[in-house]
């Protein structure tokens, strides 16, 4: 089975390939197929963005297309950065820029009011069918970055029951508990079901 991921992000591609190791599934990114176009994420929600990306790519390729979008939702900030998580500090913001802006906005806010959750939505687009799968991880925002692993908001997102930030976890540890892992687990079950149907 051929799955194409609507992303230019090598981290995401690697993560998804790891998840499907040992399964009869071939996974390609847009880069693998030489598709260089940027897909404009014009949706008002992460669900809309995931579907926009998957539908765009499905018009160009055969196979099952998946696209995801992730947002960090901070309670104290009324759900910000949300759909703007990747460009929270501006259009060409780095991970570090986004983290700095978030920490600045939460300066002086006590720990119990720094509740946040990550949500990943995966859109699966096939010939006649569109499916949305969702994963979630709850935690708190730290007052300074911790850890060297991962990417994005991982250094400032604290997983309470592990007493570590996401950036302090190994890829294996993160893959067991993250919002992406939760959504990818649902994707894996979905794909395995599709393999059984063949």
Curated annotation (Swiss-Prot):
Residues folding into a coiled coil are none
Enzyme Commission number(s): 3.6.1.66
Its required cofactor(s), as named, are: Mg(2+)
Catalysed reaction per UniProt?
XTP + H2O = XMP + diphosphate + H(+); dITP + H2O = dIMP + diphosphate + H(+); ITP + H2O = IMP + diphosphate + H(+)
Gene3D superfamilies, per the entry: 3.90.950.10
Q: Which domain of life is it from?
A: Bacteria
* Gene Ontology MF: a single term: dITP diphosphatase activity
Keywords from UniProt, A to Z, are: Hydrolase, Magnesium, Metal-binding, Nucleotide metabolism, Nucleotide-binding
List the active-site residues: 69 (proton acceptor)
Keyword Flavoprotein (UniProt)? no
Residues reported to bind substrate: 7-12, 70, 151-154, 174, 179-180
GO cellular component terms attached to this protein's record: cytosol
Cofactor remark from the record: Binds 1 Mg(2+) ion per subunit.
Q: Which Pfam family, just one, is annotated for this protein? A: Ham1p_like
Tell me the residue numbers annotated for binding Mg(2+). Answer: 40, 69
* Keyword Isomerase assigned: no
What function does this protein fulfil? Pyrophosphatase that catalyzes the hydrolysis of nucleoside triphosphates to their monophosphate derivatives, with a high preference for the non-canonical purine nucleotides XTP (xanthosine triphosphate), dITP (deoxyinosine triphosphate) and ITP. Seems to function as a house-cleaning enzyme that removes non-canonical purine nucleotides from the nucleotide pool, thus preventing their incorporation into DNA/RNA and avoiding chromosomal lesions.
For this protein, the record's NCBIfam families field holds: PRK14822.1, RdgB/HAM1 family non-canonical purine NTP pyrophosphatase
What HAMAP family does the record point to?
Non_canon_purine_NTPase
Describe its assembly. Answer: Homodimer.
Q: Family membership, please give it.
A: Belongs to the HAM1 NTPase family.
Protein name per its UniProtKB record: dITP/XTP pyrophosphatase
Q: Which organism is it from?
A: Thermoanaerobacter pseudethanolicus (strain ATCC 33223 / 39E)
């Amino acid at each position: 089975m051929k799955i194409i991921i609507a992303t230019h992000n090598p981290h995401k591609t690697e993560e998804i390939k790891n998840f499907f190791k040992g399964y009869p599934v071939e996974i390609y990114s847009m880069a693998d197929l030489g598709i260089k176009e940027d897909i404009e994420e014009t949706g008002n929600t992460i669900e809309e963005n995931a579907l926009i990306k998957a539908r765009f790519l499905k018009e160009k390729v055969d196979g099952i297309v998946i696209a995801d979008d992730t947002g960090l939702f901070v309670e104290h900030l009324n759900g910000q950065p949300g759909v703007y998580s990747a460009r929270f500090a501006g259009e060409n913001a780095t991970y570090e820029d986004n983290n700095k802006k978030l920490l600045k906005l939460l300066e002086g806010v006590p720990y119990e009011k720094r509740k946040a959750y990550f949500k990943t939505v995966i859109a699966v687009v096939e010939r006649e069918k569109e499916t949305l799968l969702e994963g979630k991880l709850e935690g708190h925002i730290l007052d300074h970055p911790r850890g060297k692993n991962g990417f994005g908001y991982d250094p400032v997102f604290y997983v309470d029951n592990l007493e570590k930030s996401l950036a302090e976890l190994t890829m294996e540890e993160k893959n067991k508990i993250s919002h992406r892992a939760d959504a990818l687990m649902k994707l894996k079950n979905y794909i395995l079901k599709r393999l059984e149907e063949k």
